[in-house]
């Protein structure tokens, strides 16, 4: 019977049955393998069930652990300051950190975040002023202290450099502006010192009529104007003679300098006139024009025209102007004590334009002209010294409560001393006795007490002192006194034993006082500006860090001409105060 059944089943049917059995076997095998693999896969947390009205209230969560920064846990903490105020600090383990924004005000310290090679670093300093290294023994013909680093003309309390006088006009105690002998002497001494320490300037000559091959073809002479080469007997040289009506375009010379901005020219007018310099600047829009006119106008700004009066100039004179300073003082002109800050810079000196009738020669542009500024200051001191030998300061000065105000016309020992230092150097450079005689006359106010329009004070009825501010009662300002001593030293050394006897005696008496009184200015962590706390019984007038470093620089200088230990020891101790050093306590 089986054989009959097998015979009846077609062989194709057997093939289909075998295929179905094979497929079923494969499917069962894959299912088992997948379930086994799923048991080893990471399981994601199930989403929380949707909240329901009847769900149980949640239990309060435990507080979050402290944040972790750089692997260190920290937490905020209240810091109680002197039982007066509370600020937020940070605790990391046993350390407590307080914000620097609070520390810098509380301790009067300084710091900032700076970046080096792509990473940030916080730089902290106890003070903000630096001490200059004394290069060598001080000499009256050498660098004056650290004045090669001074830039008097850029100070915001300098209104401008006068076109008539060639020296700075100060606004420190009055927005109207006044000539201040200290500022003028510092202007001269800084440029003198720069001349000794800087490389010689690059000078480019644009026109000099003396050269035989010099041609006027570079000049532009519009219709109605003239320009000729003539011989000037007073100068024994050829010059350019020009004539250009005020309503004309003017006779012009292209310059095109993009690197240097000190312009100089020899000039003589026979009528009213002007020399104008066109400047392209970093400011968008038309160029600025600086006009140097034959008036006594100090400075004027109108739109993009800046005007400086340079006086009549009816005899040959050399005009030297710093175009950068003149531009920025003009743009920043204000009616307040401070010149407004500006970022505008000159890019190119385009051309020079003359109007009026006169002669011009030796037009140059240079990197610097330090000696021109030095002699401008020296000559101003000679011209403006009065019959007493002083340089009166024509502005009221109020030093503080308890001191009688100084009315216009007062003298300053610091002004007298720094003027001496300037004039002595001018004499040593030129051998012109005019400068030395003016310096010798400047000792006059040192011999008279403050009550008699002098600068002399006496401490404890014994020690002579020369007052920067000859107040009543005396104030005993330290830095001004030392500057006066340096000036007396310069004069005594230069004038010699006979002519310099008065200066030498004044210097010796002053140095004796300084050595005795210097410890009175030491607080154990800084220095004191004056002795008002002793004279008036008020709080001490602590010296700012820039005055503190001035005291150090002055003592370093004196230490090269007097080897008294008090100068060396004071310098060492006072330098330590700049980095947080303090005198020992009991």
Curated annotation (Swiss-Prot):
Catalytic activity: [heparosan-N-sulfate](n) = [heparan-N-sulfate](n)
Stated family: Belongs to the D-glucuronyl C5-epimerase family.
Annotated residues for binding of Ca(2+): 208, 210, 237, 361
Spans traversing the lipid bilayer: 9-29
Regulation: Inhibited by O-sulfated heparin, which is produced by a downstream step in the heparin biosynthesis pathway.
GO terms for MF: heparosan-N-sulfate-glucuronate 5-epimerase activity; identical protein binding; metal ion binding
Topological domains, Lumenal: 30-586
Keyword Transmembrane found: yes
Outcome after substituting residue 483 to F: Moderately reduces catalytic activity
Region feature (Disordered): 40-68
EC annotation from Swiss-Prot or TrEMBL: 5.1.3.17
Pathway note: Glycan metabolism; heparan sulfate biosynthesis; Glycan metabolism; heparin biosynthesis
Bias type Pro residues, positions: 59-68
Identification of the protein by name: D-glucuronyl C5-epimerase B
Effect of residue 469 to A/F: Significantly reduces catalytic activity
Superkingdom, taxonomy of origin: Eukaryota
UniProt keyword terms in alphabetical order: Calcium, Golgi apparatus, Isomerase, Membrane, Metal-binding, Signal-anchor, Transmembrane, Transmembrane helix
Membrane topology: Single-pass type II membrane protein
Primary localization: Golgi
